[in-house]
Amino acid sequence: MAERDFIIVSGLSGSGKSTVLQALEDQGYYCVDNLPATLLVDFGAQLARRDASSMLAAVSIDVRNREFLAALPQALADLRQRYALCPRILFLEADEGTLLRRFSETRRRHPLTDDLAAALGESLLTVLRREREMVQPLADVADKRLDTSQINTHQLRLRVQAWSLASRHYSGLVLLLQSFAFKKGLPLDSDFVFDLRALPNPHYDPELRALTGRDAPVRDFLEKSPEVARSFVSLRTFLQTWLAPFAQEHRNYVTVSLGCTGGQHRSVYMVEALARLLAGEGQRVLIQHRELGITETLT
């Protein structure tokens, strides 16, 4: 089956554009980093001349490319009119505290920290705010905005995988099921969040404390509980009821987050159990156990 997708990756400096481009490249995309805006239409022309049955491409553009925002509307119009190409725009962002920390850790200069900024005595925070104002028009027209403040590199790659899969050869809804610890914060990109902290906690059994919800002894412990069984049935019914309407509304993917205290036992077990059931029914499922650093794809 034909695979066609063209993605423009942009956003704030330090938000993860390089990671996204690497993730897309690993999925078979032909990627170009920091493509000049004046070459976007020429790049589209090259894509249009390739085999029509296979076209996966992505380009990243940031504020180093200062003429891009002014040129983008006309470039997109030319791509549509001349080559029937409609790129999707993925815009990455993060909060100021996260961006400041990332620049401090990597010791890299911000692209806007030029001689003029130095002459004006601008701080990094001021430069970040100036950049946010510059790229806001692009954020407003993006097909997908992704906040990377509370996700690591591995988690970002998974988000990109889910988003890019959704409009390619797999035409159905992609479901991302993720476990997490409430004590470490809610996943920001959740469509639905379910609290499993009322279920029996294997943590209080010394023999189970070091294990996870993927281990047989923990599964056996939880499956003996009527509360766990009822919760599983309720969640299964909810997902089976609402996934189809989401797909009919042309949603690309849905993120369902299941949390417990430590993100190790109950939420991990429930994600695994629901994923096995739904994948067996033909649903495309991505699993992420945030606190365990585990990701998997089930088909």
Curated annotation (Swiss-Prot):
ATP binds at G11, L12, S13, G14, S15, G16, K17, S18. Gene3D superfamilies: P-loop containing nucleotide triphosphate hydrolases (3.40.50.300). Keywords: ATP-binding, GTP-binding, Nucleotide-binding. GO terms for molecular function: ATP binding; GTP binding. GTP binds at D62, V63, R64, N65. Pfam families: PapZ_C (PF22740), RapZ-like_N (PF03668). It comes from the Bacteria. Belongs to the RapZ-like family. Displays ATPase and GTPase activities. This is Nucleotide-binding protein AFE_3021. It comes from Acidithiobacillus ferrooxidans (strain ATCC 23270 / DSM 14882 / CIP 104768 / NCIMB 8455). The lineage of its organism: Bacteria, Pseudomonadati, Pseudomonadota, Acidithiobacillia, Acidithiobacillales.
